[in-house]
UniProtKB/Swiss-Prot annotation:
<comment type="similarity">
    <text>To M.jannaschii MJ0992.</text>
</comment>
<protein>
    <recommendedName>
        <fullName>Uncharacterized protein MJ0628</fullName>
    </recommendedName>
</protein>
Length: 166
C-alpha cells in the first residue's frame, strides 16, 4: 500500500494562497476556507479511524464504516455533538468543526455575495479576510484537541455508549 496523504498538507495550500497576490480575492478566500475545513475534517476522521480500528464492538465497526461514506461529515459532527454532552471540553471542537463546515458549504455553494452561512447569524462577505482568520482559528482548535480526543477514545465503554447515541 502506498503512503497516506497527510490532510494537514491542505494548510500549506491555504497559507500559500493567503500570501499570494491573486487579484480574485473572493475566490481565493473561498478556496482557503475549504482547505482549512478539509484539513480539519480529515484530521479528525483520521484520529477516529486510527483509535477505533481495534475496537471489536458492533457500534465501533458500524461507525468506522459510516465515516467512509458520503454523509461522513454529518456523522462525525453527530459524534462530536454527543461527545460534547458527555464532556464539555469537546464543545469547542464541535463548534469549530460545525462553523468550518458551514463556512465551507457556503463558500462552495452560495454564490450570492454576501452569502448566508447556516451557523453565523450575519451575511458573510468572502472578500473579508476575517472569515479566513476565523477558519484558521477553528482549524487550530481542532488540531490542538488531538490528545483530548485520543484520550477519550481509549475509554471503550464510554465510546460505545456515545456511538449508540448517534
Amino acid at each position: 500500500m502506498g503512503q497516506m496523504f497527510n490532510p494537514l498538507d491542505f494548510v500549506y495550500i491555504a497559507e500559500f494562497l493567503e500570501e499570494s497576490k491573486v487579484d480574485k480575492k473572493e475566490a481565493k478566500n473561498r478556496t482557503i476556507i475549504g482547505r482549512y475545513y478539509y484539513a480539519s475534517f480529515l484530521f479528525l476522521r483520521g484520529i477516529l479511524k486510527e483509535n477505533l480500528k481495534n475496537y471489536n464492538s458492533k457500534e465501533a465497526k458500524e461507525f468506522l464504516y459510516l465515516i467512509e461514506l458520503s454523509n461522513s461529515h454529518k456523522i462525525i459532527l453527530d459524534f462530536l455533538n454527543v461527545l460534547k454532552k458527555e464532556d464539555g471540553k469537546f464543545r469547542r471542537v464541535y463548534n469549530a468543526l460545525s462553523i468550518l463546515r458551514d463556512l465551507r458549504n457556503a463558500s462552495d455553494y452560495e454564490l450570492e455575495s454576501p452569502a448566508r452561512v447556516k451557523s453565523i447569524k450575519e451575511m458573510v462577505d468572502f472578500n473579508d479576510d476575517y472569515y479566513v482568520e476565523l477558519s484558521k482559528n477553528k482549524y487550530k482548535i481542532i488540531v490542538n484537541s488531538k490528545s483530548d480526543v485520543e484520550n477519550i477514545l481509549k475509554d471503550r465503554s464510554k465510546i460505545d455508549k456515545i456511538l449508540r447515541k448517534i
